[in-house]
């Protein structure tokens, strides 16, 4: 019999903005956002909940955010400050268990299956972690507790901010049936639209499709979809996860018709990328990459050997890649390759 796992997903609330709010308490009752300080070309990185009441959202162009909230305060990003807070939070995670899988500065999975303290209760452990984070940083985070990573991550988003949501093994079936398929790990806009065209919008809808049908339509991912629709996820919390890359991308509502329009997106993408990188990532950079998807869904990318994350090199890659395109751009992605440089590895790029 498979051992029942106890997984916690911690997601800090409006992390960058909350760190800024803690550093400057006068912001607490004002709508403000981090990033996107250029009112014409900027893009919001994150914002506090007061700003969200006006309709301001992450990844929103600053011009639109200012229309929705004319008195919105814009702050420059301060990644040194965010990384310092993240380091404290990560140390707290490791004080509870060695089985920690960081996903970014403000998010991590913890496997507490074998933790004997707190009556071996994942719920009590999650409460204790949240309290310890608040005691040491003054920051709040939301936690999801479940038998696997898939459900824990979904659960952590339910009672934000400063929330805790528990999915017990007996609740899995009832919990997943009404979930929109877009909540499932690996389901992006393309997969979501494809499923919708098949009459699938919820996990209950997805459960009606056979494994053979899903594999036929989605390949290897079809098998995962079959399991996810039933709340099954066998992925382990990987405390020694070796990442081969860190990347970010954005799909734009308005097609980018000029090189200048593409270059204007680089600062916000760069900020988003650096926010996802840890100190270890910076030490193991072996290359940088830029990719485009155009309005005809053609995908192209360029990679260069590099030992540092160089914004100017990213800019030059965008310029070079843009020269190869015949159609407006809909998606831009940037990232870094991680590992040890050797000729064979670079050929794989």
Swiss-Prot record:
**Localization terms from the record:** Cytoplasm
Q: Where is the UmuC domain?
A: 7-188
> Which free-text remark accompanies the cofactor?
Binds 2 magnesium ions per subunit.
* Chief location of this protein within or outside the cell: cytoplasm
Supply the alphabetized keyword list. Cytoplasm, DNA damage, DNA repair, DNA replication, DNA-binding, DNA-directed DNA polymerase, Magnesium, Metal-binding, Mutator protein, Nucleotidyltransferase, Transferase
Q: Which residues bind Mg(2+)?
A: 11, 106
Enzyme Commission identifier(s):
2.7.7.7
Q: Per the record, a Pfam family?
A: IMS
Biological processes per GO annotation: DNA-templated DNA replication; error-prone translesion synthesis; SOS response
Cellular component aspect of the GO annotation: cytosol
One annotated GO molecular function is:
DNA-directed DNA polymerase activity
Q: Where is this site: Substrate discrimination?
A: 16
Which superkingdom heads the taxonomic lineage of this protein's source?
Bacteria
Report the catalytic activity: DNA(n) + a 2'-deoxyribonucleoside 5'-triphosphate = DNA(n+1) + diphosphate
Cofactor(s) recorded in Swiss-Prot or TrEMBL: Mg(2+)
Looking up PROSITE patterns in the UniProt record yields: UMUC (PS50173)
Q: Where is the active site?
A: 107
Q: Which family does it belong to?
A: Belongs to the DNA polymerase type-Y family.
Subunit annotation: Monomer.
* Known role: Poorly processive, error-prone DNA polymerase involved in untargeted mutagenesis. Copies undamaged DNA at stalled replication forks, which arise in vivo from mismatched or misaligned primer ends. These misaligned primers can be extended by PolIV. Exhibits no 3'-5' exonuclease (proofreading) activity. May be involved in translesional synthesis, in conjunction with the beta clamp from PolIII.
Q: What is this protein called?
A: DNA polymerase IV
> What is the gene name?
dinB
